[in-house]
Amino acid sequence: METIDLIIVIVYLLAIVIVGLVMQKKASRDIDSYFLGNRKLPWWVLGASGMASNTDIAGTMINTAFIYALGTKGFFIEIRGGVTLIMAFLMVFMGKWNRRSKVMTQAEWMHFRFGKGKEGDTARIIAAFASIVMTIAMVTYFVIGAGKFVGEFLGIEPIYASLLMVVLAMTYTVASGLYGVVWTDVFQGVFIFGVIVYISGMAMSTVTLPEEFMVSVPMLDGSFTAIKTSLSEWSRITPPSEMNMPTGSTFEIYNLFGIAIMFYLFKVTLEGSSGAGGYMLQRYFAAQSDREAGLLSLFWTSLLAFRWPLIASFAMLGIHHGLNPEFSVIADPELVLPTVIKHYIPTGVKGFLIAGLMAAAMSTFDSTVNAGAAYWVKDLYQTYLRPNATEKDLMLQGRIASLVIVAF
């Protein structure tokens, strides 16, 4: 990157830390303020934070790869999670039901649901440990994916890029809890939205896809195979019942496309009927009222819809790149995103784009860590290890738990 791009990224990172630290005083009263913002955060802040947390670099790269290789069929595959259909259940039913429980975590909900006897204790402990393990796994996924992407553009090793983002995000997450998380997410959401508008505008004004073109799919042996597709097939709105991916392709599992989509839809329905978990559920526990739980869902979903024009635009620019005689078809679909940024984003704008994608990574990371730490403090430490712990002690445990989760 050029010097101006690096300056933009550095200024952005410093601004994020400052915004987060400003919220430290509000989050230092007790664990309710640290993990739920005293249940006084506006619905639009919680909704914007949710959108930012749902948008991460690794997920954007994977979804772009699907759309690039499969067209709109990739969108249907992401019914498994990327489309976040679970928000429909949260908006209509589960969001307000979870908020009414007045609990802090999904594990504490187990006591609310099954009682405080042996069954409830068992369910709560299992839920707490499972949630902590999942938090560590998700943090690892986010950090590795973001580190590879950011390291390439900053010109440093992926491990150092990951470490940079982790240290900065942990600075305000540990200090200011959910207050710092949601307000920095709002700030980062502005960057993300700016990126969406710019890339979508560029794709619409630059790209005209021909009737037939080549894309590429990954193979099980690590190689890649170029395949021909048509514009009508790539952009068809209705999903087919079957696909014809090459034998030995990692996408071959989707050849029985209709069955795969029905399975994912059934899976999301089951998950939605039982409510979400992690940082998604935390936003509803923090809502001020049933009405605001519904409003934050609507706002969250509306903002998240803009993620897909961004992903489709990156995919279109990736195909456009392969049509250029100076280049060849992008072999690895997961390299579409960095390739487009490298070849099509001008100096200055590239700095804002990298900052926006770093914002997406950090917002997902900080939300996951803050929600995960609550399981240790509320469900294990306060409930079973030190029931009479002071608020000061619980706050200390919350900060230590955040650090330990990242260290693992």
Please name every model-derived segment:
Residues 113-128, 132, 136, 377-408:
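Loop-to-transmembrane helix boundary motifs in multi-pass membrane proteins
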Residues 13-16, 53-54, 83-87, 131-132, ...:
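Residue-level recognition of pore/gate-forming positions within transmembrane alpha-helices
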Residues 2-24, 37, 45, 65-108, ...:
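Extracellular loop-to-transmembrane helix junctions
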Residues 39-65, 137, 304, 405-408:
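A generic, lipid-embedded transmembrane alpha helix
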Residues 38-41, 45, 62-78, 190-351:
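Loop-to-helix junctions at membrane interfaces in multi-pass transport proteins
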Residues 14-30, 93-107, 171, 175-178, ...:
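Juxtamembrane interface elements at the cytosolic ends of transmembrane helices
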Residues 50, 79-80, 162-166, 185, ...:
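Residue-level recognition of transmembrane alpha-helices
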Residues 52, 75-174, 245, 263-271, ...:
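Helix-loop-helix module between adjacent transmembrane segments
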